[in-house]
């Protein structure tokens, strides 16, 4: 069975009972220091591009075709970055109001909200009279079903794969999103590392759904081998994803489906009334049996959630967290140094860097991501002051000065809510020389220059934030002051040269 959660004194969401006095000191210091705050809405970063996608991307080859259309491997003409472009042909949608079109738009709207290292990232999208065009990450490793069919999967490999799936599920479930069609074919491999680790991402959010606490869904969704019993009964919640995760782990290891039955109807009876077949699991460890048993609990009220599943012994025994987040002490010191130097960045630069980080290749930001995950002791995607203090002390092997830790934390907590999230951390810790190249600065300029006039105006900034709950008069005023200070021609606009100098000024601190 899973580990019992220790009943600790939780402070500001840290999950650690450290020094309460230190937390109070930080909060007082935080209140005494004023700074403009901007809460980033992913819908701002991921937006529709009003142009022809083939003006921005060069097609390398077609890598997939289906009834929906095709998937093309493409290269961004400005940056040289490799992407996948999903071209969905509108003529293949039987009816403009059909479920298929709704699924496409649903996937787009859901993916725009999510930013997680184990979920396929969407960068931008286009639409014309004939097609939808979704620009996403390109993952060269194929789907997990293909890998499982051709490669043996060890216990530790399966544990690390499921650990990553659970991290992603924990993230989307906290956002009130359920996937509803989790299966091997919808998990893609980004790479297989030398130590045998498969790095994965969940994709295909076409049937995903926003839910409310306490409400049960009625519409059946998913693939038959992976559907939870309560889904067949048309009364289910987000825990249907945990059931699917249990099926995935079972199939990865045994190469067999967990439920008997010669056809779908008979298999459905086993899922609802009899449960999974335990015999193929007898050769595996107690840790494997424990977590699969609790993920494939037929009573969803008793089934564990993702946060609980992450505490199971299997992930500690196989050291999954450290295997996935292998980052050296030298790298950590570099990231801490970057964070210290990030403190004077203003709201305009922060917005641009957030956009560039979102559009970076995973290799460019993997180090800070690993460091964040290493510090995130309770794996809730947020790190409070005490959790940060204790994590740094554990990593460095000695206590740092409280003033130094408070200063570092202040630079990370840009939203001033007494914790920092992954986006805030990566933005501060990333190597700015990788992010602020000429090509990428041009890309950021294009992001702000919505009318493609070659100039950025305050009206375009207001337009950018129009649908955001974070459109704050103080933030807009700060943007205006910055634009005015950069506008050497006094025409209320800034050009690429002015913007480039403005962004490269960040590098002077590194």
What do these predicted regions represent?
Residues 130-143, 147:
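Conserved short submotifs of the Hanks-type protein kinase catalytic core
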Residues 125:
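Activation-segment/catalytic-loop signature of the eukaryotic protein kinase fold
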């Amino acid at each position: 069975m899973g580990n019992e959660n220790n009943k600790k004194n939780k402070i500001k969401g840290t999950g650690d009972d450290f020094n309460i006095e230190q937390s109070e000191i930080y909060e007082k210091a935080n209140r005494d220091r004023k700074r403009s705050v901007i809460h980033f809405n992913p819908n701002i970063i991921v937006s529709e591009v009003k142009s022809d996608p083939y003006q921005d991307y060069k097609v390398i080859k077609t890598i997939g075709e289906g009834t929906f259309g095709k998937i093309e491997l493409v290269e961004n003409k400005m940056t040289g970055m490799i992407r996948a472009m999903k071209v969905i042909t509108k003529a293949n949608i039987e009816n403009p109001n059909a479920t298929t079109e709704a699924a496409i738009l649903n996937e787009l709207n859901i993916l725009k909200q999510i930013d997680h290292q184990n979920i396929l990232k969407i960068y931008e999208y286009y639409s014309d009279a004939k097609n939808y065009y979704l620009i996403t990450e390109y993952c060269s490793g194929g789907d997990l079903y293909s890998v499982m069919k051709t490669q043996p999967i060890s216990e530790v490999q399966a544990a690390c794969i499921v650990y990553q799936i659970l991290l992603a599920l924990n993230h989307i479930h906290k956002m009130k999103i359920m996937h509803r069609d989790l299966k091997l074919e919808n998990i893609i491999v980004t790479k297989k590392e030398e130590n045998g680790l498969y790095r994965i991402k969940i994709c295909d959010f076409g049937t995903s759904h926003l839910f409310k606490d306490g409400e049960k869904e009625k519409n059946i969704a998913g693939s038959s081998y992976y559907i939870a019993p309560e889904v067949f009964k048309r009364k289910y919640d987000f825990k249907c994803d945990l059931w699917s995760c249990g099926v995935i782990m079972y199939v990865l290891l045994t190469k067999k489906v967990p439920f008997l039955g010669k056809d779908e109807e008979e298999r459905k009876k086993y899922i609802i009334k009899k449960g999974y077949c335990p015999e193929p699991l007898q050769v595996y460890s107690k840790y494997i049996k424990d977590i699969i048993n609790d993920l494939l609990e037929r009573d969803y009220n008793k089934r564990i959630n993702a946060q609980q599943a992450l505490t199971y012994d299997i992930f500690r025994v196989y050291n999954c967290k450290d295997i996935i987040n292998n980052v050296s002490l030298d790298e950590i010191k570099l990231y801490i140094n970057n964070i210290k130097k990030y403190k004077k960045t203003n709201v305009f630069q922060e917005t641009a860097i957030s956009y560039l980080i979102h559009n970076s290749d995973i290799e460019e930001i993997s180090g800070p991501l690993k460091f964040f995950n290493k510090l995130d002791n309770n794996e809730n995607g947020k790190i409070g002051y005490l959790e940060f203090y204790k994590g740094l002390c554990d990593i460095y092997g000695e206590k740092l000065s409280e003033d130094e830790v408070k200063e570092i934390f202040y630079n990370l907590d840009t939203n001033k809510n007494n914790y920092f999230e992954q986006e805030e951390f990566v933005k501060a810790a990333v190597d700015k020389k990788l992010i602020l190249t000429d090509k990428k600065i041009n890309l950021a300029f294009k992001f702000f220059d919505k009318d493609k006039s070659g100039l950025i105006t305050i009206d375009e900034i207001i337009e950018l934030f129009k649908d955001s709950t974070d459109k704050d008069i103080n933030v807009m005023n700060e943007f205006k002051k910055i634009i005015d200070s950069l506008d050497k021609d006094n025409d209320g606009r800034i050009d690429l040269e002015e913007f480039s100098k403005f962004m490269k000024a960040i590098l002077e601190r590194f």
